[in-house]
Structures are given as structure tokens and as C-alpha cells.
Swiss-Prot record:
This is Transcription activator of gluconeogenesis ERT1-1. The gene is ERT1-1. Its main location: nucleus. It is found in: Nucleus. SMART domains: GAL4. Transcription factor which regulates nonfermentable carbon utilization. Activator of gluconeogenetic genes. Residues 81-98 have a biased composition (Low complexity). It comes from Yarrowia lipolytica (strain CLIB 122 / E 150). GO terms for cellular component: nucleus. Belongs to the ERT1/acuK family. Keywords: Activator, DNA-binding, Gluconeogenesis, Metal-binding, Nucleus, Transcription, Transcription regulation, Zinc. Disulfide bonds: none annotated.
Length: 354
């Protein structure tokens, strides 16, 4: 029996361990001026390691931050004007405290926006009171009731009347010079709700408002005055096209702003609700609904405004006639947005349920 030798290759040599990875430089919050120009990573030391290596330690200073694009070109606020704005904001807050409201917790950079937000916050925070606080007293010169506001649905000076767009786009672009006063409309809406609903229903409505109203305030804070004027031009231009659609459609149709103010209405809707077109153009859309439908409308709108990307829903609402009779209808709501993706118009199509 023969044995064959087992041939073995040369012993394997263990490979040397890989060199340790170089430590990455830790990014600092602000690079020095030289590293910023060279687009290199800087460290937190001053002078930094790169400037020391290049013998420029005495010139190592923090670089300048770039200004936000929406702030470029804005003139600096004079010190006197800033002080005056601060005093006006403090006066607004003092008046709010006298009317039963505490100072707003959130600063939106605007006293009017802070006051609006405090209205919602205080109504929600007083659910255990016997009645909601009176934010809009009858003698208040700043917040009149809806019925006492002359031309509530009129634009500010330089704009045009809601619901009566000009005959051509050129007229719209030349006649509108000021933005629409949405804050006034919102205050009037709150005053109307307070005069109509009891505490429980009012709290349900305001809870729905609290979901979308702060978003409206926050999204408009970054817009300039020219942007707000452009938004109104977009609204009136869209309204002009829908006027043609309403005149050709046989479906009861009504258009209103995000504050609920009716801007255009078809004759079929006037017949359905037994109201004249002139009366409807001076009302909120919720004035044509029964109490249950009003609460439901604000709940639906809070979902469509920013959460639902489709911006349309089909539901049922009860419309009221001046006699008090309720007409049950199937309704299709569609939200139209402007170029800033902010809801600007709601289109409602109503069909009676027989």
C-alpha cells in the first residue's frame, strides 16, 4: 500500500489591518470667512486649523450668513417705526385683556394675526364657562357686528365689488390696487356665529376653525403686499370665468371666499333658497344652512383646506328658506387654490333631495 505525500501550499500570510479611517471634520454652525469662500469644512476653533496652517490666524473671523430670498430687497425697519409697532401691539393686547382675552401665546409677527389667534384660543379655553366671552361688544369701534358693517363684501378702496367682476381681464388687472380685507371678514364671521349659536355648538365650530385658521395666518405672513394684491387679482380673474360657467349651468351653484362670504351665485340657487341675488351677495354661505349643517360645514372645510390634497368632497347639507323651511340637498364642494397653494374660493353645487 503506497502513500502519497500531501502537498501543501505556502502558509497564508495574514494581511495587515486596514489603516484607520481619517476622522471627519465636524461641521460647525458657522464657517470662517476664508473657509466659506473656499467652500471647505471649517472647525469650531478660532483661528481654525486651516487658517493656522496657512499662517492667516489673525484674519480668521466668522463668515457672513446669506440673507433669506424673501427678505432680499426689503428696506430695514426704522427704529422709530419698530418702536411704534411694538407699542401698537401692546395696546392691542391690553384691549384684548380688558375684553376678557389673555395675551396670545404665539407670535406671528403681526398684532392683528396675534389678536385673531387669541380669539380662537380663548373660546377653546373657556369651555367651562356659562357663556362664551364677548370678544366683539356692540360698542367696539374696531369689531362691529356683520349687520352694521356697510359694504362688508366690498373690497378695500381701489378694489372691486365681490360677485360683480369686470367685463374683461384687463379691467381686473388695472382696477384692483389693494388686497381684500380677509381679517375684517373673519371678525364679522365670528360675530355672526356668536349671535346665532349656543355655547356647545359655537365651541364645535371654533374647534374646527382652530385646525385651519392658524395655517392661513402663517402662510400669509411671508407674503408681501404685492403678493396679497396679486392674490385678489387671481380671485377676481377666476370669478370671471366661473360667472360664465354659472350662467350656462342649470345646477344651483354658489361661490364663496374662504371666510364664507358669498362672491357669486346662480339664479337656480336663488330659486332653491327663495332669496334674491342681492341678498345672498351680502351674506355668509352659512346663513343659508341649518345649525347642524353649519357645524358639519366647518368640520368638512377644516379637512379640505390643507389636509385633503384632492380639495373636493360630496356630502349633504340642509339649506334654509326665509320661512324657516329646510331643503335637504346633496352638495359637491370644490376648493380652488391660488398660485401660493392657499384656498381662495369654494365652489358649491347643490341638488335638492326629493
Amino acid at each position: 500500500m503506497s502513500f502519497y505525500p500531501i502537498l501543501r501550499g505556502p502558509a497564508k500570510q495574514e494581511s495587515p489591518p486596514p489603516p484607520p479611517a481619517p476622522k471627519k471634520r465636524r461641521k460647525t454652525a458657522r464657517a470662517c470667512l476664508h473657509c466659506q469662500k473656499a467652500h471647505l469644512t471649517c472647525d469650531e476653533g478660532r483661528p481654525c486649523a486651516r487658517c493656522i496652517k496657512k499662517n492667516m490666524g489673525d484674519q480668521c473671523v466668522d463668515g457672513k450668513r446669506k440673507q433669506a430670498k424673501y427678505l432680499v430687497g426689503l428696506p430695514p425697519t426704522p427704529p422709530g417705526q419698530a418702536t411704534q409697532q411694538k407699542q401698537q401691539q401692546q395696546q392691542q393686547q391690553q384691549q384684548a385683556v380688558q375684553h376678557g382675552m389673555g395675551p396670545p401665546d404665539t407670535d406671528f409677527g403681526s398684532s392683528a394675526a396675534n389678536l385673531e389667534y387669541s380669539i380662537l384660543s380663548n373660546i377653546l379655553g373657556r369651555g367651562d364657562t356659562s357663556s362664551p366671552p364677548d370678544f366683539f361688544p356692540a360698542q367696539s369701534p374696531h369689531m362691529p357686528s356683520p349687520m352694521s358693517i356697510p359694504g362688508l363684501h366690498m373690497e378695500e378702496e381701489g378694489s372691486q365689488t365681490a360677485g360683480t367682476p369686470q367685463g374683461s381681464p384687463t379691467d381686473i388687472y388695472t382696477s384692483i390696487t389693494k388686497p381684500y380685507a380677509y381679517t375684517t371678514g373673519f371678525h364679522a364671521l365670528i360675530a355672526y356665529l356668536k349671535s346665532r349659536f349656543e355655547k356647545k355648538e359655537l365651541l364645535d365650530v371654533v374647534k374646527s376653525m382652530a385646525f385651519y385658521r392658524p395655517s392661513f395666518i402663517a402662510t400669509t405672513q411671508t407674503l408681501q403686499y404685492e403678493d396679497l394684491v396679486f392674490m385678489e387679482k387671481c380671485f377676481q380673474r377666476t370669478l370671471l370665468e366661473f360667472e360664465k360657467y354659472i350662467s350656462l349651468s342649470g345646477t344651483p351653484t354658489v361661490l364663496w371666499r374662504r371666510t364664507g362670504q358669498i362672491a357669486a351665485v346662480g339664479k337656480e340657487f336663488c330659486v332653491l333658497t327663495m332669496r334674491s341675488q342681492a341678498d345672498l351677495l351680502s351674506q355668509f354661505i352659512i346663513e343659508c344652512m341649518d345649525n347642524k349643517s353649519v357645524v358639519q360645514y366647518f368640520d368638512v372645510f377644516s379637512e379640505l383646506a390643507f389636509e385633503d390634497s384632492r380639495g373636493t368632497i360630496t356630502t349633504t347639507f340642509g339649506l334654509t328658506k326665509p320661512s324657516g323651511e329646510v331643503v335637504n340637498t346633496a352638495c359637491s364642494l370644490t376648493i380652488k387654490r391660488d398660485v401660493f397653494d392657499i384656498p381662495m374660493m369654494i365652489v358649491g353645487n347643490f341638488l335638492p333631495i326629493l
